[in-house]
Structures are given as structure tokens and as C-alpha cells.
């Protein structure tokens, strides 16, 4: 009697490698868990209490919206046949004949993976989703949720797919030899730059929120960060499209860089501020992960440690020192410092990949022969220049495309919540609160239209008192 896994069965074609398919689906699930529930939890807990529901919902909505757009149009824009040197021909990816066939990327010379196209479509969706959710981190606490709902599909179509096709889908940067092993440019540089631009156009949070924006639940924040870290093994381990040597090296290098960067960031906090910070440790973790992503499977382990050190130092300095000296950086209110933790770290990681990419590891993954980092001589100097040029293209495209998208949305929908809603938060935006505690005193009445000066008068002559344990009692 034929077994359940008999190769002759149509469900198990001859080209299917069950180990590769199982690992790729596992990696996709790990990356998906980074967003759902990882970033949902992290965003909900790292913000001020009144923005917990709104922040979580922005991530939740993006995850769902990206999946639908991805299958209907965007997968083929990023990994389909060429339309332009930086863009693929869009189209639906839900035909069963297409999804059951062997995975392939038409315009690249990557060996066809030994799993179905359905696996590849879903795996790449999880990357598109987390990139879009990262952009949200820059505008938490003031962006109009309706504007965000319009922004997500437009940014996915006109920004993300361009970077993905250009570098991963066989576009001009791929053919030229720019290295981005698993998304230092496509994901982290693009989301950081786009988030910064979005924060500029949406405008800053209210002054009270900018001056005091404590996390509402540090322990949940750590839980979300933990899911993000552990999920990164699928993020970088799944990039080779196989359960092979490169994936093993990538997983080890990923975790080593994250640990190193976290410890470096924490050490700097202790040296300069006298005590370690949980938020700082999480930021260091993220910069280490983002920094190693462009070359995780292409560098030796000692290089991963160096990348961790640089990723824990340079973004810290840019956030703590350069930010305070730049009028532009101070003007733009990047709520979760996505520009520093993702754009700066991703850029540095791409540059360091141009230095440390090992030729013996590059030959296992990359399209061009004799690819190597500058540290190994040969044509490594040219590789470093390619890395810089690739970063410039991704950054400029995201500045232009994100600006155009937001200005177009602004014609129809305000990018920013009304001032009264900004003072109230979740209850105004969603009619829901994260913690339904009696006496919080932040209730939205849609029939009232209180101007800012009236709220200032209320603050001067409050109609409430603080009871035991800080509970606000409305009089």
C-alpha cells in the first residue's frame, strides 16, 4: 500500500525537498510571528497608555492589508517578470497551477528552490508585512488611522516592491551585484527612511507626549522584543531558500550580532547615564539584528561580532549625540526612533557587508562570480562602492515615493488626528481602551468640540483629584 509520502503521489512531486519546504514554512512562520504578535505587543506596550490600542491596531491592520495586496498584485511586482529595470509586472498570485509549481524567480539566476511557489509567496509576504509595520513605528501617537489605512497598500505598491524587485527580484541592482542577503536595504533602510519622511509630513506628537512618553508595560515590551529576536532566525535563516550551510551560518551570526550590540548599547548607557535601560537594551538588540541582516550568511563569525559592536555604537551616537545637534532631526518626531534603529543600522550593515563578505560564502549565494568584500582584496573595493550606490537608490526612492503618497492622501484625508483626539488617544480613535480602569478620566464625547484653550483652562482648574495609588477621580 502506498505510504502517505510516496513520491509518486501528486502532492509530493519529484522536485519537492520536504526538508527545505518544512524549513521554509517554519522560517515564514517565525517572520510572521515577529509581526503578529511580536510588533503588535511591542508597539502596544512601548507607547503611552492612551495610545496602546491605536498602536497595536496599526500593526494588526497592516499585516492583514499587506497579505491581501501581496497575493492580488504585489508579489509579482516584486518577484515576477520584468516591467522596468526596477519593477516587475504586477498580477494575481492565486492560481492553483501557479502556486503548486516549483518556486522560481524569473529574472534571477538563483537555483530554483525545492519547494512550491505557494511557500515562496507566503515567505516573501511576511517580509513585506514587517517592513510596512516598521514604518508605523515612526508615526505612532498621532497619525490618522484612516490615512494609515490608505497609506499601507499605496506604500507597498509604489515603494516596497521597487526595492524588492531591484535587489532581490532580478532587477538592475541585483544584476549589478549589490549585496543584500536578507533585507538590510530592502527592509530596514527603506522602512527607516520612509518612517522618517512620514513623521515629517504627519508632524510631531503633542508637546506633552513628546516630553513624557513612558512605556505602559515594560514586561510586555520585553515579550514583544523577545518574539522579534527569536523570529529573526527565520528572517535570516530562511533567506537561502534551503535548509543548508548558509542558513546555519546566518542564524548563528544573527544571534551573535544581536547579543553583542545589546551589550554594547547597554554599556554605553551605563557609562554615560549611570544605569542600564530596558528600552536601550531593546534598541541595541534591534540595531544588531538590522545591522547583520545584509550579510548574515556571507560573513565569518568574527565579522558578525564587529558588526554587532558598530551597530551598538553608531546608532547610539546618532540618537544620543547627533540628534541633539541637528535642527532637522529634532524637528522630525520619529516616535520609536525607527530611522536610527533600522535605517542607520541597515546602512551600516550594508557597508560592512561590502567590507567583510567572504568569497567562499558569497559563491554559495550570490549571482556574480568572485564577489567579495574589500577586506579580501580583488574586486572588493568595487563591491563597497556598489553597496553605497545601492543604499543611495533605496534611500532616494523612499524619500520621493513616500512624500508623493502622503501628499496625495492628504488631499482626501487628514494625515493627522484632530487636536482633541490627540489629547484623548485610544478612546477617541477607536472607542476602546487598553486598560479599562475606573476613573481614568479620558473619555471621548463626539458631541463636544472642545478647543485647545478650553482644555488649557481645565488643566489650570482641574475637575478631578488624584486618589490613592494615583487613581484619577472625576469630580
Curated annotation (Swiss-Prot):
GO terms for biological process: response to nematode. InterPro entries: Ammonium/urea_transptr, Ammonium_transpt, Ammonium_transpt_CS, NH4_transpt_AmtB-like_dom, RhesusRHD. Higher expression in shoots than roots. The chain crosses the membrane at residues 27-47, 55-75, 120-140, 148-168, 183-203, 218-238, 254-274, 279-299, 302-322, 336-356, 389-409. NCBIfam families: amt. It comes from Arabidopsis thaliana. Induction: By nitrogen deprivation in roots. It is found in: Cell membrane. It holds the Pfam family Ammonium_transp. Belongs to the ammonia transporter channel (TC 1.A.11.2) family. Keywords: Ammonia transport, Cell membrane, Membrane, Transmembrane, Transmembrane helix, Transport. Its main location: membrane. One of its GO terms (molecular function) is ammonium channel activity. It is a multi-pass membrane protein. This is Ammonium transporter 2. It comes from the Eukaryota. One of its GO terms (cellular component) is plasmodesma. PROSITE patterns: AMMONIUM_TRANSP. High affinity ammonium transporter that may play an important role in moving ammonium between the apoplast and symplast of cells throughout the plant. Does not transport methylammonium. PANTHER family: AMMONIUM TRANSPORTER 2, AMMONIUM TRANSPORTER MEP2.
